[in-house]
A protein has these predicted regions:
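Bacterial Sec-pathway N-terminal export signals of envelope proteins
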Residues: 1-59, 63, 79-80, 87-88, ...
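Short segments within alpha-helical structural elements
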Residues: 107-109, 169-194, 330-386
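Amphipathic alpha-helical coiled-coil segments and their boundaries
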Residues: 23, 30, 37, 79, ...
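Generic hydrophobic alpha-helical segments
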Residues: 24, 146, 213, 337-339
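Periplasmic alpha-helical coiled-coil/stalk elements that build and connect Gram-negative outer-membrane
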Residues: 3, 107-219, 309-316, 320, ...
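Heptad-repeat amphipathic alpha-helical coiled-coil interaction surface used
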Residues: 36, 41-43, 48-50, 90-92, ...
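A small-residue-enriched
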Residues: 22-82, 217-282, 286-289, 293-294, ...
Length: 395
């Protein structure tokens, strides 16, 4: 990525812990998508070396003829490219190599963001399973209590039935939470290539938002990759134009015919009649127009992605701060008040169940809010092109 972004945002607040960086670095080393991108880059580098060379090698020819006089000749011929041709091909290949180098950075950042987001979803899933288990136990205990109170005639049949339904719903929600966790662990295992382990957890301390005004969108890897693709397409026009110029073939031969020495020089030049190369030039120009449009799309997409992820993270972080400031304590206090009101007979069984469900729903929403905020943070780092700097993974 560009040095401007690295200089401005290389150390955003909330630097990743070393343990998390070590896990991600291990995943990156073994990731097949990154390995494939690295292989494509190596292939492009090799092609760039070959693109600057002449396409044709010298040819050696031996001719022998026996008639009244024996004739033998040895010759060497070479198709000579105009010197601008290899240079034009080399420049176009260099641009494609630069594009793939930026695409490799882009792939790495996408993989790292996906891995970090996967960690968050697994951590969130485990927290939701723990909460669902607590809900199941609470509802089960209350259903047992309601059944006893019903037998003693203290509550109505409908109230006891409501408690049993709530307990059943809690069991179902716990099963759903277990399934969601299993799916999250499966997706993460597919991404990391290892079976579920003690993945890292994420606390409620969210980093401060990035100042996206410091981000130079033109230096983001996705934009740079598109820019070099356009540059390569522009240079391919020159390649196609030079390919229209015929390459002469020059040859020399030496031999003998009977007792006489033979020496000859030959020069041949193709006549571009059947294929003038105009269609290749037209195609190259069309490809250049397409690459220019792709660059504009990449610029627009990167700018929108950066702006919207920043807005989304700021909104989620503000909600998280508000929850920690007032909502979390309010839920704990309300749970105690609710239990005292039930014990004192101030509320009935059904009202107690409704309010208790609301408290559990609020806690579940807070878990989801925290997970969404962390995912948005990692997406913001990716959008700003600094997720590798934040996590501390070396390229």
């Amino acid at each position: 990525m560009g040095s401007a972004n690295a200089a401005a945002l290389a150390k955003p607040e909330g630097q990743a812990p070393a343990a998390l960086a070590a896990i991600v670095a291990s995943v990156v080393r073994e990731n097949p998508s990154i390995a494939a991108a690295e292989a494509r880059l190596k292939a492009a580098e090799a092609r760039a070396v070959g693109a600057g060379l002449w396409r044709n090698n010298p040819e050696i020819e031996y001719d022998s003829e026996t008639a009244e006089v024996r004739t033998e000749t040895v010759g060497v011929s070479q198709t000579v490219e105009w010197f601008s041709k290899p240079a034009a091909r080399g420049r176009a290949a260099d641009s494609r190599t630069e594009s793939l180098a930026r695409e490799l950075v882009n792939v790495r950042q996408r993989v790292i963001t996906g891995v970090l987001s996967g960690f968050v979803l697994v951590d969130q899933g485990r927290a939701k399973v723990e909460l669902a288990s607590d809900r199941t136990q609470s509802m089960s205990r209350f259903a047992d209590l309601s059944e006893r109170l019903f037998r003693e005639g203290d509550i109505s049949p409908s109230a006891a039935q409501a408690a049993r339904v709530a307990a059943t719903q809690a069991v179902m929600r716990e099963q759903v939470a277990q399934i969601d966790l299993s799916n999250a662990e499966q997706e993460l295992a597919q991404l990391t290539g290892v079976a579920p382990i003690a993945w890292p957890s994420f606390d409620t301390s969210l980093p401060e938002p990035l100042n996206i005004d410091d981000v130079d969108v033109e230096q983001l890897p996705s934009v740079l990759a598109a820019r070099f693709r356009r540059e390569a397409a522009d240079r391919d026009i020159k390649v196609a134009q030079w390919d229209r110029v015929p390459d002469p073939s020059v040859g020399v031969r030496y031999g003998d015919e009977g007792n006489s020495d033979l020496f000859g020089i030959s020069i041949s030049i193709p006549i571009p009649v059947l294929n003038s190369g105009r269609s290749e030039v037209a195609a190259a120009r069309a490809d250049a127009v397409s690459a220019a449009v792709d660059l504009q799309a990449a610029q627009r997409s990167a700018s929108i992605f950066l702006r919207e992820t920043a807005r989304r993270y700021e909104a989620l972080r503000s909600s998280q701060v508000l929850w920690l400031k007032s909502g979390e304590n309010a839920v704990t206090q309300q749970a105690d008040v609710l239990q005292r009101r039930l014990d004192g007979g101030d509320i009935g069984v059904v009202e107690y169940l409704v309010q208790l469900q609301q408290l559990y729903d609020a806690q579940e929403s807070s878990i989801e809010l925290q997970g969404q905020a962390w995912v948005a943070w990692f997406q913001l780092l990716q959008a700003a092109g600094v997720v590798e700097e934040w996590i501390g993974v070396e390229r």
